[in-house]
């Protein structure tokens, strides 16, 4: 069994004829998010996918097998929801609520696409959006720092968080040498002369001497 262990960077230009002759590996989105996978090429050949951790494959990516042969990635048709709305505000609200749930979304012209989910379909309908179930390739937006399928409970979430923290530090953090020198000299000189002349007799007459008139 051949092993596929490299992805050619998108900015590397390959001869169109060379890529066209390469066998195709057609995968649904969920499978394209896995760096370790037993898969079958469209030719029927079984292969092992062993890519760097956190790799998310996209339609059109070109991979390299251990024998140097090329393999082309294609996004499979799968069950999706097409989300449209009567106005921009409703579509924006839909996108906000989906993002709040860390839902992978493909953004189109006046349309959002996401993996089929009846619960989300109901939520979006309640927001005023129009939902259509379809069978189509799904290629959601990548994360702002290069990720794809990342949630708070995923191991790869830590990678995005670390990158985000690095960007923040570069712009606002350690490199700016903010010497905040928080020396709070609280010389409040609290002279609380309460004159608590507590005559703890039977009547406990508290002579506090606060001068409250």
Curated annotation (Swiss-Prot):
Q: Where is this region: Disordered?
A: 170-213
Query: What domain of life?
Result: Bacteria
Q: Where in the cell is it found?
A: Cytoplasm
- Show the GO cellular component annotation of the record: cytoplasm
Give the UniProt keywords, A-Z.
Chaperone, Cytoplasm, Nickel, Nickel insertion
Pfam family membership, one: UreE_N
Instruction: Supply the InterPro entries for this chain.
Output: UreE (IPR012406), UreE_C_dom (IPR007864), UreE_N (IPR004029), UreE_N_sf (IPR036118)
The record's section on SMART domains has: UreE_N
Molecular function GO terms recorded: nickel cation binding; unfolded protein binding
Composition-biased stretches, type Basic and acidic residues, lie in 182-200
Asked if the keyword Cytoplasm belongs to this entry, the reply reads yes
Biological processes per GO annotation? protein folding; protein-containing complex assembly; urea metabolic process
Please state which protein family the record places this protein in. Answer: Belongs to the UreE family.
Q: What's the stated role of this polypeptide?
A: Involved in urease metallocenter assembly. Binds nickel. Probably functions as a nickel donor during metallocenter assembly.
* Name this protein carries in UniProt: Urease accessory protein UreE
Organism in which the protein naturally occurs: Burkholderia thailandensis (strain ATCC 700388 / DSM 13276 / CCUG 48851 / CIP 106301 / E264)
């Amino acid at each position: 069994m051949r092993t596929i262990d490299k992805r050619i960077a998108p900015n590397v230009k390959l001869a169109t004829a060379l890529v066209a002759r390469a066998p195709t590996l057609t995968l649904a989105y969920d499978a394209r998010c896995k760096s370790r996978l037993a898969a079958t090429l469209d030719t029927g050949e079984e292969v092992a996918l062993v890519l760097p951790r956190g790799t998310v494959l996209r339609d059109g990516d070109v991979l390299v097998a251990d024998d140097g042969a090329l393999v082309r990635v294609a996004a499979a048709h799968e069950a999706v929801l097409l989300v449209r709305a009567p106005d921009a505000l409703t579509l924006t609200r839909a996108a906000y609520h989906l993002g709040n749930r860390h839902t992978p979304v493909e953004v189109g012209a006046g349309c959002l696409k996401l993996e089929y989910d009846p619960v989300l379909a109901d939520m979006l309908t309640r927001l005023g959006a129009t939902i259509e179930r379809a069978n189509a390739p799904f290629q959601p937006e990548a994360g702002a720092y290069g990720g794809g399928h990342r949630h708070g409970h995923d191991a790869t979430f830590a990678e995005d968080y670390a990158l985000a923290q690095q960007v923040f530090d570069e712009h606002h953090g350690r490199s700016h040498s903010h010497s905040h020198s928080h020396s709070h000299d609280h010389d409040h000189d609290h002279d609380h002369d309460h004159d608590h002349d507590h005559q703890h007799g039977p009547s406990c007459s508290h002579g506090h001497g606060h001068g409250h008139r």
